[in-house]
Structures are given as structure tokens and as C-alpha cells.
């Protein structure tokens, strides 16, 4: 859950030095130290933490298992459990990868590549803003950092409840993204697109039917956000799918950014058809690296009248 902060994002407040924030400062310093550890140690820590989370976070574990069971019916129960455990591993690896992107970005040198950059370059050459249709990848800001080595990305964000944590994350992300735009600030999003920005936008979570429609996601009806239609229509921007993922030996990983051609006729006159198309794009992306997505979120929590509960 997030909320608006009563001060400009990223701004330091003297109140952050009060004792109630000391635990967060200590935690941040500890995380900064983790970022300078060799990847071999980070990799082992990630596996250990993933195993611990698997045991302790029962609700997240059940949600992950249920989601994978629904979305990959071709998997056996044993495969579902194995892949669910890997989701937790990839999430922990993503934490270390994000710390590296924030505090030790040189670690990524020589480890990344991009395919399809011309789709963004051509759109911007025509004066178009670009809405990058992505996902909530477990790579987190590591993916954003890799994108920033090839073009200037903006990002949509949700403010954190804790004001100190919000400031620290905002400042770390400021080293990666050109602009960070509150997900509720439609005017700024539209303005940035009109100015020719390339905004990473992830329409892959359940925010209810006030902000979307029911559309199949891996064959399961899911509340699907439709705000991108308004953004594209008003700004005259184009929608371009973007996906990034880790591959190869996890002990010496490589990273790839995959950019696809412009989604034609988006938005169309049919809201549900657009939602279906976006979900199909996301499905295709997730099949590349199925465990590098946040399956522990309740993607199917909203059930319209007549639909059975999932969880």
C-alpha cells in the first residue's frame, strides 16, 4: 500500500534524523554493504533467504502456487512447486541485482544486451512519446538500469508509506530514470509523453474494476487496467512492449532487454479487446522467463459477479 507524501519526492527532511528512523538508516547501511559483496556470495545469500521466505511467508507461498497452477495447467504439481520456489529465488536475486544497480552499477558492465532498440528510436525520431508496456519483473530496478544504458527511460512509481524509505528509494532511482512520475498523476504522465518521453508502464496487476475491465490472463478472467488507453489517446503516443530478463548460468548471469514493434491500433474503439491484447503481450513476455515475475501478488483477487473466488 502506498500514499501521497506531504513534501516533494526525494527531499531530505531533518525529521529523518529522529530516533524513530534510526532502524531504517541502519538497514540501509547494511544493504549498501551487501551491494559490494561478490556475486558468488550474493547468489548464495539469495538462495538462503528464498528458502527462509518460502517457509515463513505462507500466504505468499500459497498465492504463488495457486497462480502458477492456474496459468500453467500443463505443469505437473511437482513442476508447479519447483517453479514456485524458483520465483522466491528470483525475487531475492532481484533484490541484490537492484542493490547493485543502485550502489555498484559497474557490476553489470559487459553483462547486458538489447534487441529492438530501433522501435523506440524510430518513434522518438517521429516526435512520438513512447509508453513502454512492461511487467513487474523480479529484476526490479536492475532492469531499469540496463535500459538506461541504451536510452533514457522514465518510470511510473507508487510512493512508499514510510517517508524516509520513500526518499531513499526515490534518490536511488533518480540515478537511473530521467523522470519518476506518480501513478496517480495522469497530467504529468500525459505531459511527459507529449514531450517525447519513454515511460516504463506495467499494466499487469489487479487494481479492481474501477480502473479496468475483466479480460483473460493466461485464460483466467482477471481485472485488467485500461488507463494506458487514455494516456495513449490524449498524448498521441505509441505503445511499445518491453521486457528484460536474466539468462544463462545464474553464477555468471547475462541480461537482455527485448523491445518489440509498436502495437498497432492501440487504443482501438474496443476497451475489452485492448485489455485482451495487452494481457496477451504480457503472457508472451512471461513465457520467456516464467519465474522472473511477481507471482506472489494476487493477480486474480477481483472477481466480478458470477466468477468463482480464486484464493
Where do the protein language model's features map onto the residues?
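Catalytic core of membrane glycerolipid acyltransferases/transacylases, capturing the structured
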Residues: 126-184, 209-212
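Membrane-anchoring hydrophobic helices of lipid-metabolizing enzymes
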Residues: 2-131, 167-168, 172, 177
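Residues that cap or flank secondary-structure elements
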Residues: 56, 111-112, 135, 161, ...
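A generic structural signal for short
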Residues: 53, 108, 157-158, 177, ...
Amino acid at each position: 500500500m502506498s500514499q501521497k507524501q506531504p513534501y516533494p519526492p526525494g527531499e531530505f527532511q531533518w525529521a529523518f534524523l529522529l530516533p524513530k528512523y534510526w532502524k531504517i538508516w541502519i538497514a540501509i547501511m547494511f544493504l549498501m554493504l551487501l551491494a559490494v559483496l561478490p556475486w558468488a556470495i550474493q547468489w548464495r545469500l539469495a538462495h538462503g533467504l528464498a528458502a527462509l521466505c518460502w517457509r515463513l511467508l505462507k500466504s505468499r507461498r500459497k498465492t504463488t502456487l495457486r497462480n502458477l497452477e492456474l496459468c500453467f495447467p500443463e505443469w505437473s504439481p511437482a513442476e508447479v512447486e519447483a517453479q514456485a520456489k524458483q520465483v522466491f529465488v528470483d525475487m531475492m536475486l532481484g533484490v541484490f541485482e537492484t542493490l547493485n544497480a543502485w550502489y555498484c552499477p559497474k557490476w553489470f558492465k559487459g553483462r547486458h544486451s538489447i534487441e529492438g532498440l530501433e522501435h523506440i528510436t524510430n518513434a522518438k525520431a517521429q516526435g512520438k512519446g513512447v509508453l513502454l508496456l512492461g511487467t513487474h519483473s523480479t529484476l526490479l530496478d536492475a532492469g531499469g538500469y540496463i535500459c538506461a544504458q541504451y536510452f533514457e527511460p522514465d518510470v511510473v512509481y507508487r510512493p512508499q508509506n514510510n517517508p524516509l524509505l520513500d526518499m531513499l528509494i526515490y534518490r536511488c532511482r533518480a540515478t537511473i530514470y530521467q523522470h519518476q512520475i506518480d501513478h496517480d498523476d495522469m497530467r504529468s504522465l500525459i505531459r511527459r509523453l507529449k514531450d517525447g518521453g519513454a515511460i516504463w508502464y506495467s499494466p499487469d496487476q489487479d487494481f479492481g474494476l474501477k480502473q479496468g475491465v475483466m479480460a483473460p490472463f493466461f485464460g483466467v478472467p482477471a481485472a485488467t487496467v485500461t488507463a494506458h488507453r487514455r494516456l495513449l489517446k490524449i498524448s498521441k503516443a505509441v505503445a511499445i512492449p518491453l521486457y528484460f530478463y536474466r539468462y544463462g548460468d545464474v553464477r555468471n548471469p547475462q541480461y537482455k532487454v527485448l523491445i518489440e514493434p509498436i502495437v498497432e491500433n492501440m487504443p482501438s474503439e474496443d476497451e475489452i479487446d485492448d485489455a485482451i491484447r495487452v494481457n496477451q503481450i504480457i503472457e508472451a513476455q512471461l513465457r520467456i522467463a516464467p519465474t522472473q515475475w511477481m507471482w506472489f501478488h494476487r493477480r486474480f483477487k477481483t472477481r466480478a459477479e458470477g466468477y468463482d473466488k480464486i484464493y
